[in-house]
Amino acid sequence: MNMKRKFAALAAALSLSACAGAQTGAAQPPTNVHSVTSRYGFDETVSRLKNAVEAKGMTVFALIDHRAAAQKAGLDMQPATVIVFGAPKAGTPLMVKDPDFALRLPLKVLVTETDGQVRAVVADTRALIADSGISVADVENTLDRVPALIEKTVGE
């Protein structure tokens, strides 16, 4: 077999392999986020999560309405609001232990609606602390409780 045919066969095999991998990967749920299907509408979900965070003594630093920003730019997108929140008493010791961890705080929860389904999405705690100087033990009574709070507040 000449070089051109070998190269063509190799390219075809790699293409098929990549396609098979992409299909397999698409079927796997992302492991770096925790997603909760809300039993409420979009606005109610945002409101309930904001109130739940504040009721737990955390501060809501910002609400980022991505859809409004898109519309202001002449674009359209699905409803998507990010609630930026945290508790300095919990976050400060983590940032003292690992100053670069400040890039991952404050926490964020995305509320989005696609095809009539409202979801609240937050970074998985293990993914959040991966490649940092923070251990699971450092966050088990703080950051690690956020997915349960979201589930309790809006979960089906």
Regions found by a protein language model. Give the residues of each.
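Bacterial N-terminal signal peptides that target proteins for export
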Residues: 1-9
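Bacterial N-terminal signal peptides
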Residues: 9-18
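Terminal, regulation- and interaction-focused segments at domain boundaries
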Residues: 20-57, 152
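Soluble non-cytosolic domains of exported or imported proteins
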Residues: 36-44, 61, 137-144
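Compact, glycine-rich, soluble single-domain proteins
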Residues: 42, 50, 54-111
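Beta-strand/loop substructures that line and gate deep hydrophobic ligand-binding cavities in soluble
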Residues: 108-132, 136
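C-terminal partner/receptor-binding element of secreted or periplasmic proteins
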Residues: 125-156
